[in-house]
């Protein structure tokens, strides 16, 4: 069982790293940073929802491949923010991004571990490991809507 979990985590890491490392640049040049980041957020929302419904390892692996475009989001959002900040404030921006990322990772780990434990607790009338995925999909959906609303008209269609 643990080898299977380790294997799926390794596959996910390779897929995410491949998208982020090898496809972000070409995709953003062809379609524009905003479009590719938005596509990555939509893929993440749909795939997180799917993880909550899938019932087989093959289904999980298929969803992992579809999850790959989420790897575009962080570098492209960082790039878009970098272009809005003067050169003498780049360090502050990168420090702020790093701080927010670290707090979100800490909060997310605690929150989703609690969610998983709550919905898998013994004696619950309804147990499901899937609720955490559905909550994550909801969080990413809110992020996607906010991204679209806040950046409306700023960089859509702009190819960099």
Q: What residues fall within each predicted segment?
A:
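A membrane-interface helix-boundary motif in multi-pass transporters
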Residues: 114-140
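Intracellular juxtamembrane helix-capping segments at the cytosolic ends
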Residues: 72-86
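Multi-pass alpha-helical transporter architecture, strongest
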Residues: 134-160
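Loop-to-transmembrane helix entry
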Residues: 3-17, 128-130
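A late C-terminal transmembrane helix in Major Facilitator Superfamily
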Residues: 90-120
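Helix-to-loop junctions at the C-terminal end of transmembrane segments
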Residues: 19-33, 116
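Structural signature of the two symmetry-related core transmembrane helices
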Residues: 35-50
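Helix-loop junctions at membrane interfaces in 12-TM secondary transporters
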Residues: 50-63, 73
């Amino acid at each position: 069982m643990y080898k299977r979990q380790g294997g799926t985590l390794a596959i996910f890491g390779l897929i995410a790293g491949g998208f982020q490392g090898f496809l972000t640049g070409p995709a953003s040049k062809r379609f524009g940073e905003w479009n590719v980041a938005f596509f990555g957020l939509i893929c993440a929302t749909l795939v997180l929802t799917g993880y909550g419904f899938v019932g087989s390892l093959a289904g999980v692996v298929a969803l992992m491949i579809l999850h790959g475009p989420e790897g575009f989001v962080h570098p492209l959002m960082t790039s878009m923010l970098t272009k809005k900040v003067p050169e003498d404030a780049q360090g502050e921006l990168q420090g702020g991004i790093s701080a927010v990322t670290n707090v979100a990772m800490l909060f997310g780990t605690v929150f989703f571990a609690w969610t998983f434990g709550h919905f898998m607790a013994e004696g619950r009338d309804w147990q499901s490991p899937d609720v955490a995925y559905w909550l994550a999909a909801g969080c990413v959906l809110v992020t996607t809507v906010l991204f679209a609303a806040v950046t409306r008209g700023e960089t859509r269609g702009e190819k960099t």
